Structure formats: C-alpha cells, structure tokens
Amino acid sequence: MIRVAINGYGRIGRSILRALYESAKRDRIQIVAINELAKPEAMLHLTQYDTTHGRFHTQVKLDNQHMIIGDDAIKLLHEPNPANLPWKELDIDIVYEATGVINDRQECEAHLKAGAKQVLISHPSSNDVDATIVYGVNQDLLRAEHTVVSNASCTTNCIVPVIDVLDRHFEVKSGAITTIHSAMNDQQVIDAYHDDLRRTRAAGQSIIPVDTKLARGIERILPHMKNKFEAISVRVPTINVTAIDLSVTLNKRVDIELVNRVLKQATEGSFSGVVGFTNEPLVSCDFNHDPRSSIVDGTQTRVSDGHLVKLLLWCDNEWGFANRMLDTSLEMIKAKRSS
C-alpha cells in the first residue's frame, strides 16, 4: 500500500480521488491527506456532487478535520506553503501536485523537504524534473532515484501513444495538430479581465484560440520527433471531453483500412486500457468518464495520396488523465522498490 496526498483539490485533484474509489487500485493506493485552501464544507460538497461526473457513489461526511469516505478518514489541510505540510509525520510516499501552479523542481522540492518521498505533477513541468511520463509509452524510464516526475498533459497523453504506433509502423515524417478542448477554469463565465485578451471573453459563447505547447510536449516524450510537429488549440463551449485533429505525413504508403487495423490492434495489445478504438457514430459526451487516455474514432480516418493521414482522437481530459496519475504513481513506486 502506498500512502499519497493530494495538493490542490480542484478538477484534477477531485478526479484523482474519485477515480481511485471507482478503480481496483484501492488495495494499492491510500489517500492519506488533501491540502486545499477552500473550506472543508466546500470540499465535501464538491466531492459529493459533480456537474460533469455525477454524484459520488460512496457516502462522504466531515468529522474533526477529516473527510470520511466509507471506512477511510482523509486528513484535510489548508496550508498555503508546501514546506509546512506534515508529510513526514503522515509518512507520505507520493504527493499528487495538482494545484496547477507548482510546476518546477525547486517548488516541488518543498514537498520533499516536508517529508514526502516523491512528487508527481499533474501538468507539464519545467525541464529540470527527473522525468516526464506518458503512461503506456515511456514509464520504463522511471528510476529509483527519481523524486520529481511530471505526468505531462491530458492532450500529450492522448496523442503521443497514437503517434508512437504510427511511427513504429509507418515512419512519421511530420505532423500538424488542432486540439479542440473543452472550456477550463482559467476562462471567464462572462467577459472579464485576463492577461490573455482572448480569454477575457465569455467561455460559453465563443470558440477561443489559446496558446499550446503540445508540439514541444511531444518532443519531450519522443525526442526523435523534434521539429516535426506544430500545434494549435481552441477552447469550445463544452465542460468536458476533448477532440484532437491529428494530421501526419508518413514515409510508408498506407490506406484507411491499414491505418485503422494497425491502430485497433495496438488498442488490443500493448495499449489495452490506455488507448481505445471505435467505429460507432459517437459524439463528445459519449466519452465523458472514459478512463482511457485516447480513443481513435475510426469513422473519421482519412488518407490523401497514400501518405497524408488525418485522424480524430477523443479523450476525457479530466477522467482519463486522473487515471493515468494513478497508473504513473504505481510505476514510480515499482521503480523505487525494485532498486
């Protein structure tokens, strides 16, 4: 059993907790504490009720600065400085760093100084972390001495396994990506001030282009893809589930049937449970609460001139990513204990 703490109980933090309680990993992972500046009553309410993922299936209550879920008592903390958190006292193996604002090694080391053994960041990080992992592709890079690890981003986890399969079978020459991402909490409900002028506009009324570093994220996981990809991203007025429009030029000649067959075989083999494949006529809400990192929509595969391939990928940008946080943390402990 590994003892974990969640720092930051927002969309991803709560999804991690819910994903754990809906999975078979509860016999291996125990959430010991949650650090969040919000009031306990609000934390309880947002655990019980969720607009996107529905009601929590287990009874939850507060008792003496603990959140009680079934027979589990999770300590609630409200400390703004990670260095002051009682991780040593609580014997924390891994901190899930889910605030969204702590993303470099120096900031994460505050958790280590407080007594945590390792930190897993729930978003892209600076280059000074020990490793950036996309589960299913490069978790074998984890080493016992790694203390600060990034789980990359939901979109990187969605697209990299598919690029990896295409490259191994057909040799990817170059690619272009459009991420069609649900609205996020860094946007405005109605027009209001933001450093990004496009994000001053109401999230529910427009398709809003935003900056993305997805192409650089691909390079970090697949270094041989350096300078081969470019990406743009738009936010759309939905609350969850993201689509990715992926176009790649391949060195080998292909057709639609071959591309779909290879991708489907990968989902039944090495990427089982991580990448899915569908030929059903589905829409974005059909992938809500899907635990996989990526689902290839085979009905939308297109091939031009035998070498240019266009794919449509789906992912639940909250739930799929939260499940990968659990998977990566187990791999971190496995690497640490195998030394």
Curated annotation (Swiss-Prot):
Q: Which family does it belong to?
A: Belongs to the glyceraldehyde-3-phosphate dehydrogenase family. Epd subfamily.
**What is the gene called?**
epd
- Per the record, a Pfam family? Gp_dh_C
Catalyzed reactions per annotation: D-erythrose 4-phosphate + NAD(+) + H2O = 4-phospho-D-erythronate + NADH + 2 H(+)
Record-annotated residues binding NAD(+)? R11, I12, N317
GO molecular function annotation: erythrose-4-phosphate dehydrogenase activity; NAD binding; NADP binding
Q: Where is this site: Activates thiol group during catalysis?
A: H181
Q: What is this protein called?
A: D-erythrose-4-phosphate dehydrogenase
Under which pathway is this protein filed? Cofactor biosynthesis; pyridoxine 5'-phosphate biosynthesis; pyridoxine 5'-phosphate from D-erythrose 4-phosphate: step 1/5
Entry function: Catalyzes the NAD-dependent conversion of D-erythrose 4-phosphate to 4-phosphoerythronate.
Gene Ontology terms: biological process: glucose metabolic process; pyridoxal phosphate biosynthetic process; pyridoxine biosynthetic process
